[in-house]
C-alpha cells in the first residue's frame, strides 16, 4: 500500500482521480481495466508530462522491473485492498486477475487545462491497447526503461526473466537533460513538492 506519510493529500486526490478518469474512458468502450493497464498508463502519463512540460504529473518513483516501469507504491496499493486510494477506486479479482473500477465520478479539481488535455490524449491513444502492448511500448529501444536497464547492466537479465524486479530508479529528468528550461522547471517542481512534504511532517 502507499505510505500515508509520503504523499500529500493533493497528490493522492490527483492520482485517485486520474485512475478514475482512465477507468471511465476504458469502461465506456467496454474495455476491462486491469492493474497492469493502469500501472503502465500512469507511467506513460508521467513520462510524456516530463518530456512535454518538464513537470512530473504525479511525482511517483518508477523502478525497472521485467514487466515494465513500475511504481512500487502504486503496485502494492492496487495488489491489495486500497488504503489511501480507497475513496477513489474499487479492486476486484476475477480468475486471479486484478481489475480496477471507479468508486465515484471523476473530479477535475486537481488538474489544470494542460493536464486534462494530456489525460485525454493518453486515454485516446492507448484506449484499445492490451496490457502486453503497453508493456512493449514502454520497453521499446531508447525508452527510459530500456536505457536505464541497459545503463545498469540488467537489460539481458530482465528480458530473459532471470531477474523480475530491481530497485533501480528510472530518472525521467534524464530525458530532458539537454533542455535547460524544462530541466529547471522539473527541479523547481521537485523542490516545491519536497518542501510541501516537509511542512506536512
Predicted features along the sequence, with ranges:
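Domain-edge interaction signal
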Residues: 1-201
Amino acid at each position: 500500500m502507499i505510505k500515508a506519510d509520503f504523499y500529500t493529500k493533493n497528490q493522492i486526490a490527483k492520482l485517485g482521480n486520474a485512475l478514475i478518469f482512465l477507468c471511465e474512458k476504458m469502461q465506456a468502450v467496454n474495455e476491462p481495466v486491469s492493474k497492469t493497464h493502469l500501472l503502465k498508463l500512469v507511467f506513460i502519463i508521467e513520462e510524456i508530462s516530463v518530456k512535454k512540460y518538464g513537470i512530473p504529473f504525479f511525482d511517483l518513483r518508477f523502478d525497472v522491473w521485467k514487466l515494465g516501469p513500475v511504481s512500487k507504491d502504486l503496485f502494492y496499493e492496487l495488489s491489495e485492498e486500497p488504503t489511501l486510494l480507497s475513496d477513489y477506486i474499487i479492486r476486484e479479482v476475477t480468475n486471479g486477475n486484478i481489475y480496477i473500477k471507479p468508486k465515484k465520478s471523476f473530479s477535475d479539481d486537481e488538474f489544470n487545462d494542460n493536464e486534462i488535455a494530456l489525460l485525454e490524449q493518453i486515454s485516446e491513444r492507448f484506449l484499445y491497447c492490451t496490457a502486453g502492448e503497453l508493456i512493449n511500448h514502454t520497453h521499446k529501444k531508447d525508452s527510459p526503461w530500456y536505457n536505464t536497464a541497459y545503463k545498469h547492466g540488467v537489460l539481458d537479465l530482465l528480458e530473459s526473466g532471470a531477474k523480475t524486479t530491481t530497485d533501480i530508479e528510472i530518472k525521467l529528468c534524464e530525458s530532458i537533460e539537454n533542455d535547460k528550461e524544462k530541466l529547471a522547471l522539473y527541479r523547481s517542481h521537485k523542490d516545491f513538492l519536497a518542501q510541501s512534504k516537509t511542512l506536512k511532517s
